[in-house]
Amino acid sequence: VEAVEAQRIGTGFAELDRVLGGGFVPGSVVLIGGDPGAGKSTLLLQASTALAQHQGVLYVTGEESLQQLALRAKRLQLPMEHLSVAAETRAEVIAQLVERQRPKVVILDSIQVMQMEALDSTPGSVTQVRETASFFTRLAKQHDIVIVLVGHITKEGGIAGPKVLEHMIDCFMMLDSPAGSRYRTLRGHKNRFGAVNELGIFAMTDLGMKEVANPSAIFLQRGDVDSPGSIATVTWEGTRPLLVELQALVDDVAAGHPKRVAVGLDQQRLAMHLA
């Protein structure tokens, strides 16, 4: 079998392309998960409208009406004239739309509401998620198109549905939203066509997701003046170095056993470092 270099499809977001390994690969299936309100749908709608200026894109929503989608796009000031949209949850009908429109990229929001009409189980069940994911994976390979699946997560932080879902897809990303922060981090956990653990950073604004061009600036709170108990250091995230700030506060203790507490660092890991 001869290996052919695939022409990647840029998303219009350098941070998203970084996590993908340079853009979407034709014939691949991408899964993006995250907490409710993290911005998964917002990010993908922005990327879809940007892609639609040069590529055929089909955005399928199963969780909101077309009117709601249009209102969201209007609020974000996104051009919708070149984007094909559909409100549908039946996998077979979506396949017919793909056959008829021949898009290069298909967004499905979300995999947990998609269903196969031949199955008796309810949408979101283990059987439905497994079979619809398998169906869309075959569809992507058959037509050499990109299919992006939005996935809900459980209370434990994993993707809702069978574990086999993560094995079917080619790329798995998580969009995290730290409590009380407007910043979002997109991290790749699996990528058959690029490096894993790549990190993309965005800021949620009134007009949607904006890329953070200099992530080190948001991790450093120190000024030019030296501050006792504070240092700047470098950490690697994927292929990118980031400057972060470490702060320490020491106080006298009357008890026989001093207590060590860390914010942003696992307590067991802290104990190992201090041992």
What are these regions (language model features)?
Residues 1-2, 99-106, 112, 168, ...:
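Conserved P-loop NTPase
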Residues 1-23, 114-121, 151, 210, ...:
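P-loop NTPase nucleotide-binding/switch module
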Residues 1-78, 95, 99:
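The Walker A/P-loop phosphate-binding site
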Residues 36-38, 63-67, 75-78, 89-93, ...:
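Conserved nucleotide-binding/hydrolysis micro-motifs of P-loop NTPases
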Residues 55-57, 81-82, 102-105, 142-149:
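Loop/turn-to-beta-strand initiation segments
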Residues 73, 158-168, 198:
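Short regulatory helix/loop adjacent to the ATP-binding pocket of P-loop NTPases
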Residues 127-148, 152, 168-179:
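Substrate-engagement module of ASCE P-loop NTPases
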